[in-house]
Amino acid sequence: MYPNRHRRASFCSQPRTYPRNSLIRQQSLFKRNVSKRRPFQTVKMVDDSMMKAQRIHENQYGPDFSLAHNTAVSTFISYPDIAKSLPNRTRSYIKLKRLRFKGIVKVERVHVEVNMDCSVPKTEGVFSLVIVVDRKPHLGPSGGLPTFDELFGARIHSHGNLAIVPSLKDRFYIRHVLKRVISVEKDTMMVDIEGVVALSSRRFNCWAGFKDLDIESRKGVYDNINKNALLVYYCWMSDTVSKASTFVSFDLDYIG
């Protein structure tokens, strides 16, 4: 790349001379090239300045997030709409920076089983919260999101290290896994959950894109996302007849 750098010696005893006219031509040519590039740089700076750092908040709770034992639920993180009120977005794309979540899981024993010695068995199980990036979002033939079993093979795999099935690795990848092993003798128990997921870094930027086919469809729902949707999977595995109810708040930091 630098052929003269590693030579032992390379000297020239006579000073180099350049015609005066050639220097003038080189200087004027350089100035013209610089002036041509300035308008492009100015336009790019103005375009980027219209996008600003924002945060969108979302709570996920209710009957749809109450899991019976050995079941799983799939959902998605809502993105901002094109709107005048904040938080919003001004383009058909946003830069995803960071996702924070915090909440509780309430584990309840549904039917109390009493043993011969009048003791109540423990409620033991594994609760998992998995955040997955969907590179090419689209609804399946059933009209719903991919299920836990379709993505990871089986719910029982939540006891070990989760992995995307080979046939779907080109479309999905796991971004974060939170797992809690729960053992409780009481009828109910509250478990705190919390985590931070970095989506972009100095070396890598994660951009989400939207279809925005018309004015009414410029929403942040899964059906309007065409690049890098964030999916959330909740799973509760237990041999005891029980249920796990979740209340989780998500804060998505983005530039849009």
UniProtKB/Swiss-Prot annotation:
Q: How does it sit in the membrane?
A: Peripheral membrane protein
Protein's GO biological process: DNA transport; transport of virus in host, cell to cell
Print the keywords alphabetically.
DNA-binding, Host cell membrane, Host cytoplasm, Host membrane, Host nucleus, Host-virus interaction, Membrane, Transport, Viral movement protein
Q: Does the keyword DNA-binding apply?
A: yes
Biological role stated in the UniProt entry: Binds to the genomic viral ssDNA, shuttles it into and out of the cell nucleus. Begomoviruses use 2 proteins to transport their DNA from cell to cell. The nuclear shuttle protein (NSP) shuttles it between nucleus and cytoplasm and the movement protein (MP) probably transports the DNA-NSP complex to the cell periphery and facilitates movement across the cell wall.
Of which family is this protein a member? Belongs to the begomovirus nuclear shuttle protein family.
Q: What is this protein called?
A: Nuclear shuttle protein
